[in-house]
């Protein structure tokens, strides 16, 4: 053994060939944490010191190659002063450069996922051979960063600036075939032939058949582009990528600027430019929020996995209520492999549900995401029915009928009488109390809420609602089924609106106050979209449905009359009474025309001003900053209350619920991280400035206590890649 550590070993194989193997003890994946980087330095030094070494192959002892850097270490590292961070980054990069500069040929055998620093390690080798099942990429832009272990330097010198920009700015994972096509790897082989292929390649390099020094040299030189080529490659790309990413996500454009700036230099100077730019990105609020979001997502997945031990497998599902929602649920279940019955009392509703599922499957077929055989298999997994005849062997039923407690109770009681004693019933409701609905059931322990978001196939969140009598097995099984459907489940406790709608309606409450204060709703939409929301509140209300919003507002007002009840007529009342229901009937705050693709397109409608005139009670001068605060303070404070009330267990779940459920701007990290970014004490002071607007703007006693004690919602990182 030439070197043995906790993450890396180096052993002799044959004829001067050694294997440097990554296998981080106690972990399911390899990653570049401090330990691994330090051992890589020692391993490279050990290889350099051994005169008998003629070539190195790099392998992984795990199913993946290396998933990247240990993101949990970022949180503390990025708090360091810039100069210290740059120095640390350059020190890490010297390790990769020392590996690259070995006086013998090097081959990396990529057996599985190689992302971020994992792929950057591969780029430092002379040759790369990949398993046909492996995937590679540089996803750092998704964290508000860009590659910091030499990726912006080596990749463009290996595959050209255009291809490198596409790989780095998109942050996509790429197949082995795509990697071979652009030249990221030199060969692709079947998984079982990977080791043999790597050995063959290194032997041919040692023998001189392949000139490894000539292969290495372009990575050490400046980028081979003349001035015109540089302008075409970089200036065009910057404009296009800026349009795609938007102003709130600077990392992709900054990555291009770094590649451009470093293009005229050799490797070592180029790495210095990369390090300075990487650290600049690490200090942005976008990076801090997106890293927090990543860690929250990992925590969410861990929590969901924690239910696996108690969960029963859902082999057969059913959905009550066809139509668009039922069809969407049926599609999602079937396409992910769980057969599902789709029941309704009307044949036309069944047809509507089947049409919805067929349309969604057809869309995937057109985009190449599904084969014709898989589409047929998924369609066959959806069995329409008008009766309960086949419900005896169903493991879980999703009730998705009209949002009316009496109707839901009647349907749930009826289905309970037609299923097995252990069958779980889950109500897809957005606001109605699960404990209230459970009163109609003989086995309330088998009943939970399962709130899907519309459109089902696109929205990643499912709220699993625990009622007063819901058993742990019922909750766990529903969580497992949601995961099986490809969704991100969050378990919440029962209350009006649960988590997402309970938080959303105070946001709408802020909007209603602004409109009643004479602020143009089009301006409000523009300000909130600029803030980072995918759509402004007026447009969102139109998409949700004015009638749905009207009903939800009343439910929330009944549940929380102290702060959500408003006796004055609002914009939603005025539109509802004028039968302007939003996109569903072509007119709400906006009117809707059909575009060339058959999708609704919003258009301003002067006539709506007459409808809204009676609910404008004053004319206030408000700044754009005021608009943001009128909207965001109620949303943030209600999120705080949900956490304090135990509706949601952790700050991470609360924030991810808002990002996945209502499109909270990801680069701001979620409501609680947004408070942290302002500072809890500063946020409380900000809310107090708007206290005259009512109870929605009143911080809780506990939040004031946090402010006084200098506390925050997110302390140390607790999850790993």
Curated annotation (Swiss-Prot):
Keywords: Fatty acid metabolism, Isomerase, Lipid degradation, Lipid metabolism, Lyase, Multifunctional enzyme, NAD, Oxidoreductase. Signal peptide: none annotated. Residues 312-721 are annotated as: 3-hydroxyacyl-CoA dehydrogenase. GO terms for molecular function: 3-hydroxybutyryl-CoA epimerase activity; delta(3)-delta(2)-enoyl-CoA isomerase activity; enoyl-CoA hydratase activity; long-chain-3-hydroxyacyl-CoA dehydrogenase activity; NAD+ binding. Substrate binds at residues 297, 501, 660. Disulfide bonds: none annotated. Pfam families: 3HCDH, 3HCDH_N, ECH_1. NAD(+) binds at residues 325, 344, 401-403, 408, 430, 454. Transmembrane segments: none annotated. Pathway: Lipid metabolism; fatty acid beta-oxidation. It catalyses: a (3S)-3-hydroxyacyl-CoA + NAD(+) = a 3-oxoacyl-CoA + NADH + H(+); a (3S)-3-hydroxyacyl-CoA = a (2E)-enoyl-CoA + H2O; a 4-saturated-(3S)-3-hydroxyacyl-CoA = a (3E)-enoyl-CoA + H2O; (3S)-3-hydroxybutanoyl-CoA = (3R)-3-hydroxybutanoyl-CoA. Residues 1-190 are annotated as: Enoyl-CoA hydratase/isomerase. The record marks 120, 140 as: Important for catalytic activity. GO terms for cellular component: fatty acid beta-oxidation multienzyme complex. Its EC number is 4.2.1.17, 5.1.2.3, 5.3.3.8, 1.1.1.35. InterPro entries: 3-OHacyl-CoA_DH_CS (IPR006180), 3-OHacyl-CoA_DH_NAD-bd (IPR006176), 3HC_DH_C (IPR006108), 6-PGluconate_DH-like_C_sf (IPR008927), ClpP/crotonase-like_dom_sf (IPR029045), Enoyl-CoA_hydra/iso (IPR001753), FA_oxidation_alpha_subunit (IPR050136), FadB (IPR012799). NCBIfam families: FadB (TIGR02437), PRK11730.1 (NF008727). Heterotetramer of two alpha chains (FadB) and two beta chains (FadA). In the N-terminal section; belongs to the enoyl-CoA hydratase/isomerase family. In the C-terminal section; belongs to the 3-hydroxyacyl-CoA dehydrogenase family. This is Fatty acid oxidation complex subunit alpha. The gene is fadB.
């Amino acid at each position: 053994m030439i070197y043995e550590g906790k993450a890396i070993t180096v052993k002799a194989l044959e004829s001067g060939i050694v294997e440097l193997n990554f296998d981080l003890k106690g972990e399911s994946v390899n990653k570049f944490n401090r330990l691994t980087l330090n051992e890589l330095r020692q391993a490279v030094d050990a290889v350099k010191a051994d005169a008998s070494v003629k070539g190195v192959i790099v392998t992984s002892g795990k199913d993946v190659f290396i998933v990247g850097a240990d993101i949990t270490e970022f949180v503390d590292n990025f708090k360091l002063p810039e100069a210290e961070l740059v120095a640390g980054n350059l020190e890490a990069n010297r390790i990769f450069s020392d590996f690259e500069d070995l006086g013998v040929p090097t081959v990396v055998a990529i057996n599985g996922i190689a992302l971020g620093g994992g792929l950057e390690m591969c780029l430092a080798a002379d040759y790369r051979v990949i398993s046909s099942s492996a995937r590679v990429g540089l996803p750092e832009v998704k964290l508000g960063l860009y590659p910091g272990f030499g990726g912006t330097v080596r990749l463009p010198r290996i595959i050209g600036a255009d291809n490198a920009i596409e790989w780095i700015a998109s942050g996509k994972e790429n197949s082995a075939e795509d990697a071979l096509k652009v030249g990221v790897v030199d060969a692709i082989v079947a998984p079982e032939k990977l080791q043999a292929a790597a050995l063959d390649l290194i032997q041919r390099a040692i023998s001189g058949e392949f000139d490894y020094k000539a292969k290495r040299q372009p990575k050490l030189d400046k980028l081979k582009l003349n001035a015109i080529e540089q302008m075409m490659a970089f200036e065009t790309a910057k404009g296009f990528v800026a349009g795609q990413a938007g102003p709130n996500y600077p990392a992709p454009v900054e990555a291009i600027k770094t590649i451009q700036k470093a293009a005229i230099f050799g490797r070592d100077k180029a790495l210095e430019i990369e390090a300075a730019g990487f650290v600049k990105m690490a200090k942005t609020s976008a990076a801090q929020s997106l890293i927090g979001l990543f860690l929250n997502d990992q925590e969410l997945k861990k929590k969901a996995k924690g239910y696996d031990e108690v969960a029963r497998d859902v082999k057969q599902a059913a959905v009550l209520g066809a139509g668009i929602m039922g069809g969407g649920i049926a599609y999602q279940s079937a396409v992910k492999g769980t057969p599902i019955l789709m029941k309704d009392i009307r044949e036309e509703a069944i047809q509507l549900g089947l049409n919805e599922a067929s349309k969604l499957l057809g869309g995937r077929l057109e985009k190449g995401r599904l084969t014709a055989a898989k589409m047929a298999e998924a369609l066959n997994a959806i069995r329409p029915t008008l009766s309960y005849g086949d419900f005896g062997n169903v493991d879980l039923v999703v009730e998705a009928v009209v949002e009316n407690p009496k109707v839901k109770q009647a349907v749930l009681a009826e289905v309970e009488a037609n299923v097995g004693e252990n069958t779980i019933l889950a109500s897809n409701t957005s606001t109605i109390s699960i404990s209230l609905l459970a009163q109609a059931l003989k086995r309330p322990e088998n009943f939970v809420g399962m709130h899907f978001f519309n459109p089902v196939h696109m929205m990643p969140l499912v709220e699993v609602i625990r009622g007063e009598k819901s058993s742990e097995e019922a909750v766990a099984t529903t969580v497992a089924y949601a995961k099986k459907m490809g969704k991100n489940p969050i378990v919440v406790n029962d209350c009006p609106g649960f988590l997402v709608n309970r938080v959303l309606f105070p946001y709408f409450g802020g909007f209603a106050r602004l409109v009643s204060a004479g602020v143009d709703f089009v301006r409000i939409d523009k300000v909130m979209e600029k803030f980072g929301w995918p759509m402004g509140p007026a447009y969102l209300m139109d998409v949700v449905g004015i009638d749905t919003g009207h009903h939800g507002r009343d439910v929330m007002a009944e549940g929380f009359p102290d702060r959500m009840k408003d006796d004055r007529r609002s914009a939603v009342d005025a539109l509802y009474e004028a039968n302007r229901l939003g996109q569903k009937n072509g007119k709400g705050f906006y009117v809707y025309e059909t575009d060339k693709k058959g999708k609704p397109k919003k258009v301003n409608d002067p006539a709506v001003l007459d409808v809204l005139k009676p609910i404008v009670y004053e004319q206030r001068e408000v700044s754009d900053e005021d608009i943001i605060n009128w909207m965001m303070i109620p949303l943030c404070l209600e999120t705080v209350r949900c956490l304090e009330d135990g509706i949601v267990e952790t700050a991470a779940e609360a924030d991810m619920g808002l990002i996945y459920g209502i499109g909270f701007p990801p680069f701001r990290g979620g409501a609680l991280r947004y408070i942290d970014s302002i500072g809890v004490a500063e946020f409380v002071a900000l809310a107090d400035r708007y206290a005259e607007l009512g109870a929605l703007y009143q911080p809780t006693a506990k939040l004031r206590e946090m402010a006084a004690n200098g506390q925050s919602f997110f302390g140390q990182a607790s999850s790993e890649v």
